[in-house]
Every structure is written in C-alpha cells, then in structure tokens.
C-alpha cells in the first residue's frame, strides 16, 4: 500500500494491482485525532488486508528502476526459494548449487563491484533492496550475497590493483565463492586477542591456529583470513588479512586441503551455508595473497567494511521481519475460529500485524538512510549501527509475534514461522552484537554532543 496525501485527501494505492482507493479528509483527520486507538488500528489492519496481495506496504521511496530490480528478485525468490526454504532448513541442507548459479546469473555476487572489475556497479541502496528480497525468502540466500560483499569491500578498499583484477571478476561472476575466517574460540568480539599465526617462510606464509563460526567455510574457494603476523605487536596492530585460496569441499570431504581440518557446528537457525570450526596446521598462503601486500593492516582493513556489512545485515533483518509479517498475516487471514471468523478479525491479532508493519517501515527507512549516506561517501557508522540494531530487534519482535498469532501451531516445526523465529535470533548476535552496536552508538553520540 502506498499512502500519500494529495490535496486534502488520503490516498491508498496498491502499486502492483493498480487498486486506487480514496477517503476524505474527515476519516483521515479522525485517525489523527483519535491517536493510537483500537478502532484506528483496526482501520489500518483492514487497509493492510485489502492490499495484502501486493506484498508491498507503505511507500519505501524506490524509483522506477529500483522497483523493477526489486520485482525481478522477488520473482526469483517466489519461484526458487520460498517453496524450498523450509525443507532446506528442516533437513539442514546446503543451498543447492543450482540456486547459487541462478543467483550468479542475476548478478547477486557482483551488485556493488565496479563495472571495470566485472560487477554491476550498483549502489549500496540497491544492494539493500535486493538483500531484503533475498532474505525474505530465506536468510541463507540473503547471506550468500554477504560473503561476496565482505570480500569485495576488503579488496576495493585495501587490495592492490593486481589483487582486484584477479579476484573481483571471479567473485562477481560467482566462479569463486568467498568466506570470512575471522572469529577465534574464546575471543568473542575482541579481534585484538586473536592468536592464529601467519609466519613468513620464503614465498609463503604458514598459517597455524584455530578459527570458529566460519559461514560457508567448506564450500568456499577463497578465505578472507585474519591472522597475526607480528607476535610482538599486541592487540590489533599485529594482525594481517590474507586472500587464502582453498579447494571447494562438501559434506563428505569438508576440507580437502593439506593443513586444514575442521567440522560442522550444528545451529538453531541461519542454515543453508552451514557453520564450521577450522584448524590450521601448516597451511600455506602465497605472499602475494597478503591483502594490500603490507603486514599489520588487517584490523584497519576490516574496519573499512563494517559500515557496509552492518547496513547489509540490517537489510537481511528486514527480509526476515517481512517474511514473519507476511507469514503471520496469511495465517491470521486463513485460520478460522470456532465461530467461522478469521483470526485476523480479532483486534489483538490485527493490532500485532499493524505494529509489525509499522516497525518494519521504520527500520527500513533508517536502513535506507544509512545506505544513502554510505553511497554519498559520508561517515555512517552511527547510522549503520542504529539500523542494524533496530532492524534486528524488529525481526525478532515480528517473528515472536508471528509465533504468537499461530498459537500452538507456531511451536510446531512443520510451520515456517518456527524457522523464521530461529533465523531471527542470530541477527542480534552476528556482524556486531546488539551490545557492540549500542557501544558504537553511545560513543558517537558522546563525541558529537560533548557535555
């Protein structure tokens, strides 16, 4: 539904189906004067229900080109992802390569990579719109693009020209699937405590140490690997980033390379790519694969990616929230009570739906604003942190309300809302915990508003 004020009248449009309804100023003014009343919320709930077939509520401010891109990815999700997502989750399957190949054809992995390196050269804003659509179908699908995003951002901001020319076209085409090998056991969010070592030895670095929570680690072709090159430099300064190539593994042989071993971590949600522990024991990386060909810049290079990564993660959260909203709303409309009435006609259920739609729109606009600031080249760690924190909270709240609307059925694994709840929980943890985001926001507020 697109809500807009034209003259003195409130217009509600369904962009997709061409529906146009118009109500006079009296009804519009009543909604304002009555405030957050049950009656007003029920009116809004009815407007949402009337436009539900469009799956697009509120004016998100997309131009015509971006709207076409959104529709293209929505069709892909509806055809290839949504019908299969719950089965992938329940069986804990890797996302099929056939689906990844379709994503490659659509340009998912090269969206923000400049055209001169084989990408589409799209904006961070467009990337948000696409990511939300992908995550709306399945968080694992939306997160596949994140692997390429992180790798591309590292290369664009910190790589040599030779490294950019070698890796960016392969990442953009989907020929090379990257993964981030960062977190270590017992380190939590403290990168300065990392112990994995990279020792220069002739034309190679030898990697020794342990990593955990490696998303898509087995099936990837190149690792963004953070290791300590200078043991005398404590904290962040001794860390370096490597573009460590590896053989692609599978469920039967996860890590075929000499010097790498590991295993799968069974997880509550966020499936489809799988999580791994990895042990490095004498694994070789060519010296030319040191990012930027300069030691000690690893943490700084990672910092360069944080704004983009958190904006993209906020977009993933929006997709999960939208999925929870649509799933709950459809269930409430279809499910009849003992008197033959729809659950959606119950004020408490309708009120939950209205709150979900409102919170999603608020989080979406904050995320879009952060993305636009990033596209302008402005510092946006404050906005990115806020967007990630808010969108993650909204996703969890929407999933929780969705389960409640389903009642006992929401607790049954056969219903997709149970998967959405599991998927939404990770959003407050990865790519910077909610607590880390709060710290960032606090520091920025203090620095810009000193006492």
Which positions does each model-derived feature cover?
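Glycine-rich beta->alpha junctions and the first turn(s) of the following alpha-helix
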Residues: 2, 57-71, 136, 256-361, ...
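N-terminal glycine-rich flavin-associated loop
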Residues: 81, 142-162, 188-191
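Amphipathic, small/basic residue-rich leader segments at the start of a protein or domain
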Residues: 8-145, 166, 170-173, 177, ...
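Single conserved hydrophobic/aromatic residue that forms the stacking wall/gate
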Residues: 1-7
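C-terminal helix-coil-helix/basic helical segment that borders enzyme active sites and/or dimer interfaces
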Residues: 8-9, 13, 82-90, 330-337, ...
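A short core secondary-structure module
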Residues: 204, 208-258
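Internal helix-turn-beta structural module
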Residues: 408-436
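A structural signal for short hydrophobic beta-strand segments in well-ordered beta-sheet cores
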Residues: 196-198
């Amino acid at each position: 539904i697109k809500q807009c004020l034209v003259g003195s009248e409130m217009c509600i449009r369904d962009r997709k189906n061409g529906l146009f309804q118009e109500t006079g100023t009296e009804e519009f003014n009543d909604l304002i004067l009555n405030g957050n009343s049950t009656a007003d919320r029920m009116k809004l709930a009815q407007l949402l229900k009337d436009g539900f077939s469009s799956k697009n509520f509120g004016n998100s401010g997309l131009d015509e080109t971006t709207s076409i891109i959104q529709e293209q990815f929505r069709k892909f999700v509806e055809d290839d992802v949504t019908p299969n997502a719950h089965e992938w989750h329940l069986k804990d399957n890797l996302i099929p390569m056939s689906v990844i190949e379709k994503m490659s054809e659509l340009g998912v992995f090269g969206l923000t990579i400049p055209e001169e390196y084989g990408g589409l050269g799209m904006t961070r804003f467009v990337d948000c719109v696409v990511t939300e659509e992908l995550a709306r179908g399945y968080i694992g699908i939306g997160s596949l693009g994140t692997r390429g995003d992180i790798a591309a951002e590292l290369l664009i901001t910190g790589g040599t020209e030779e490294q950019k020319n070698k890796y960016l076209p392969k990442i953009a085409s989907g020929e090379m699937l990257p993964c981030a090998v960062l977190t270590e056991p017992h380190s939590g969010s403290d990168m300065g405590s990392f112990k994995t070592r990279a020792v220069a030895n002739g034309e190679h670095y030898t990697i020794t140490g342990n990593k955990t929570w490696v998303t898509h680690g087995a099936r990837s072709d190149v690792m963004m690997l953070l290791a300590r090159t200078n043991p005398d430099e404590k904290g962040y300064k001794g860390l370096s980033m490597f573009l460590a190539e590896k053989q692609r593994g599978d469920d039967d042989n996860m890590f075929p390379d000499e010097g790498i071993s590991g295993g799968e971590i069974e997880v509550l949600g966020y499936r489809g790519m799988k999580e791994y522990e990895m042990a490095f024991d004498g694994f070789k990386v060519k010296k030319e694969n040191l990012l930027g060909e300069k030691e000690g810049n690893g943490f700084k290079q990672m910092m360069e990616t944080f704004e983009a990564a958190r904006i993209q993660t906020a977009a993933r959260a929006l997709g999960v929230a939208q999925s929870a909203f649509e799933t709950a709303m459809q269930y409430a409309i279809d499910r009849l009570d003992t008197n033959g009435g729809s659950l959606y006609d119950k004020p408490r259920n309708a009120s939950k739906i209205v709150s979900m739609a409102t919170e999603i729109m608020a989080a979406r606009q904050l995320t879009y604003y952060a993305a636009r600031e990033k596209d302008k080249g402005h510092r946006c760690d404050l906005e990115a942190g806020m967007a990630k924190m808010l969108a993650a909270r909204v996703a969890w709240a929407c999933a929780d309300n969705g389960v409640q609307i389903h009642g006992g059925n929401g607790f049954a694994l056969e219903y997709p809302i149970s998967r959405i709840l599991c998927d939404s929980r990770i959003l407050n943890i990865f790519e910077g915990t909610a607590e880390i985001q709060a710290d960032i926001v606090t520091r920025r507020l203090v620095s810009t508003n000193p006492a």
